[in-house]
Amino acid sequence: MQYTFPNYYKEFSCIAGACPDTCCAGWQIVIDDQTLKKYQHFKGPFRNRLHNDIDWKQHVFRQYNRRCAFLNEENLCDIYTEAGPEMFCGTCKNYPRHIEEFEGLREISLSLSCPEAARILLSQKEKVHFITKEKKTKEEVYDDFDYFLFTALMDTRDMLIDIIQDRTVPMQKRLWKLLAAAHDFQLCVNKNELFKWEEIRKRHEDSGYGDRFCSKIYSRINADNIENSSAASACANTPEQLFKKMWKAVVPEMEVLRPGWQKYLENCLTPLYNGNTDPQPDSGNLYSWQKSEFDFSYPDWQIQEEQLLVYWIYTYFCGAVYDDEIFAKVKMAVVCTLFIHELNVGTYLKNNRQFKLDDQIRICYQFSRELEHSDLNLNRFEELMTEKEIFSFENLLKIC
């Protein structure tokens, strides 16, 4: 069995009571069958509490006010203190370690939903790389696992990460290239033409980011603008209006895991989407000006944006071996990262133009919790990338 993990993986150590939040609230923690049996046979004074605060039908810990029943007032776990760490279920033992399973391979990441894991990721200045180690285990075989597609996805992901990490190129062009390549790979899968993948990879690598590449992108954007050429359509296709529509397409579809999440979004985004124009002449609307101001005031975002894109692509891209949804996964990576940027700018404005690493960490882990702590949300978000016209290839090119 091969195990792959990011180079910063072993930097993680739980900070327990010093954590600004808790991983034991806002989501249902599923208990694995092996641990359930241990709980059933547990003896001692903690037995009654253990039995009463587990939903044995659903195989989850009960919750009170969205908090795990075993989470005490100090935000520490009573199972740990009363029964010992060996009584943790698989989820609690592993978190924030996230594992994607493939035949003969486990890909491990640190979930962005953990504040300390988010801090480690966002503090990385060097390009993230991945380490693979091998352990002797019983050979496994997955029924209907398309190994040919999987190896193509692995090679393609390496290429996409190389694109994201090319710091000689402005991020806008990297995002364009990322989307364009994923778009073409998806067409190949749709036509069952995997044999063309190598040709597509080479074409995108050779085309670089020069005038020819940019002219193709501009042509795609302009063709879409001509198709929607009325004054009303043009106004509705500005980056600001597109982002507003994207939020409106996503938020109502999501299960709310923590009370106050939608109010938090409103408070963050209202300063950014207030509809005014910049009082300074010829400097564009206030929206664009404020985003540029944030990027100048918080230069760390340049690298943090890269690290977030790599995080999403590494974690989810190769899952396309199970559903063929290549483009949707890349779209999701781009949209999630740009949504976080919008929340950054709104927070910067709300906080009187102050923004620090702690703000970035808080935004990232809260966003991740609402998305990644719910399979329903994660799956629905990805589905929306394909279902909703607002997330079209052309619209995403416009907001990069």
Task: Label the predicted regions.
Residues 1-46:
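General N-terminal leader/first-domain-start detector
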Residues 4-5, 73, 320-323:
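Short linear interaction motifs
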Residues 11-18, 127-132, 236, 312:
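Short, compositionally biased low-complexity segments
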Residues 11-29, 63-98, 111-118:
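Local cysteine-cluster metal-coordination motifs and their immediate loop/turn environment
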Residues 14, 82, 146, 150, ...:
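Short, charged/polar micro-motifs that form catalytic or ligand-binding hotspots
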Residues 27-74:
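Membrane helical hairpin/interfacial module
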Residues 83-187:
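Internal, well-ordered alpha/beta segment that forms a basic, Gly-enriched binding/recognition surface
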Residues 171-400:
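Hydrophobic, aromatic-lined core segments that form the binding pocket/scaffold
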